[in-house]
């Protein structure tokens, strides 16, 4: 059976045989799974190759990648506005990444580990622990963003100690 561009069509069809729908009716679960934003992309779930979407620019001047899927961009701008109303500053450090950009990040990290003396397989494994391989990053579907604030500009756990993190 062919999958839709989000993979949700096959998931929606499997709802009929499930009894663990978290209190949803089968119709409600099917409707939710038919939503093109209901996509799971991570280190074990690759983004469908034919997944397409429109982007909008919503990042700060310093953002590496300033775009997100239009719906995510609009949500981020609303979030940013609400934070500002409470004197909290939050910005997008990095948003949508094309698969080719993700490939570059992943290969750069892999090559770093190879230069440290690791073989190809181990270097790729170590790189994947830090930078998801192309097609396996939430950033590739335009629905993920790395956020930051003036209190902490690094892309690490230090953000947890900021007013922006507490506000979020």
PLM feature spans:
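Extracytoplasmic cell-surface/polysaccharide-interacting catalytic and binding patches
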Residues: 1-95, 99-168
């Amino acid at each position: 059976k062919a999958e839709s561009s989000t993979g949700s069509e096959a998931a929606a069809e499997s709802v009929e045989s499930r009894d663990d729908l978290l209190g949803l009716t089968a119709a409600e679960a099917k409707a939710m799974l038919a939503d093109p934003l209901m996509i799971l992309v991570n280190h074990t779930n690759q983004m469908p190759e034919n997944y397409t979407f429109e982007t909008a620019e919503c990042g700060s001047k310093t953002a590496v990648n300033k775009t997100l899927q239009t719906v995510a961009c609009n949500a981020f701008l609303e979030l940013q506005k609400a934070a500002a109303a409470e004197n909290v500053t939050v910005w997008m450090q990095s948003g949508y990444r094309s698969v080719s950009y993700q490939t570059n990040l992943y290969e750069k990290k892999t090559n770093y580990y190879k230069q440290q003396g690791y073989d190809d397989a181990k270097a790729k494994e170590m790189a994947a622990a830090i930078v998801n391989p192309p097609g396996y990053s939430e950033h590739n579907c335009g629905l993920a963003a790395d956020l930051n604030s003036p209190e902490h500009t690094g892309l690490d756990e230090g953000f947890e100690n900021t007013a922006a993190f507490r506000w979020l």
